[in-house]
Amino acid sequence: MPNSFRTAVIGLGSMGYGVAQSCLRGGHVTYGFDVVPSQIERLQSEGSMKGDLADIAGTLDAAVIVVLDAAQTEDVLFGKRGLVPLMRKGAVVLACATVPPNFARTMEARCSALGIHYLDAPISGGSAKAASGQLSIMASGTPDAFAAAAPVLDATAETVFELGDAAGAGSAMKAVNQLLAGVHIATMAEAMTLGMTQGVSPEKFVEVISQCAGTSWMLENRAPHIVAGDYAPLSQVNIWPKDLGIVLDIAKSASFSAPITAAALQQYLVAAGMGLGREDDAAVAKVYARNVGLTLPGAA
């Protein structure tokens, strides 16, 4: 890849910032944009370029959209200051948010009408893997979209799953992943706090269950947050009402019953209602603790 490959990352949260760092490390001429100016300045201190998005849009080879949801994605691409109409023909958009499959198909069609490739490219792996260029990307799009996006995929991903030649398949797979991930976090919290009622300490829970058949990646990643009493958000509680809501919308459209997903969603909604929405999603354990009068580590 020539060092002149030009990439903009829009959305410099915990995942997007890591994606931008990986693009920098991969030799891209990298721009970063966010609603929080300090995030832009921080990335610039690491080597990203300065510039207004509207001014540099026509020079980009790729735009990586790492925002919260479908509404923010659409606003970035086609809103009042929409990016896509300003991009040069043949450039590519990689859309990384968790969105409904039909939304991804619509964005692909709108981008294609303006000569822009669209890769449905939801990401997984957490902020550490984003920063180290080791994400898993569940991607779908035309062969030309994959080809145009290759330098970004090479810089940011350890594994790229090529799931089809049209947008939507990537987002469908991400929804399935989020079903499992959201349920696993909630059931980890349920199991840990049930154990506490029987005298099993959170520390011993993590030590033992992480080595047993009941473990999961989410248990091993999130349960230590509870043990440490550290709810600084790597992934917020507020993510899950949105993501599990997408899962249930897909299920409804398929006349598919998803009762376990629905039960997990309720726990996240209760957590958000308790004012925990901006805390790490491991804070769903506080719902269970409150219900039975338990004191979690680090609680006052």
Language-model regions, residue ranges each:
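Beta-strand segments within the central parallel beta-sheet cores of soluble alpha/beta enzyme folds
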Residues: 11, 203-211, 262-266
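Hydrophobic beta-strand scaffold residues
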Residues: 30, 50, 117-119, 160, ...
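Rossmann-fold NAD(P) dinucleotide-binding segment
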Residues: 53-117
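Active-site-proximal catalytic alpha-helix in oxidoreductases
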Residues: 133, 137-140, 161, 167-198, ...
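Rossmann-fold dinucleotide-binding core
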Residues: 7, 98-178, 182
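NAD(P)+-binding Rossmann beta1-loop-alpha1 motif at the extreme N-terminus of oxidoreductases
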Residues: 1-66, 91
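Interdomain hinge/lid region at the active-site interface
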Residues: 171, 180, 215-279, 300
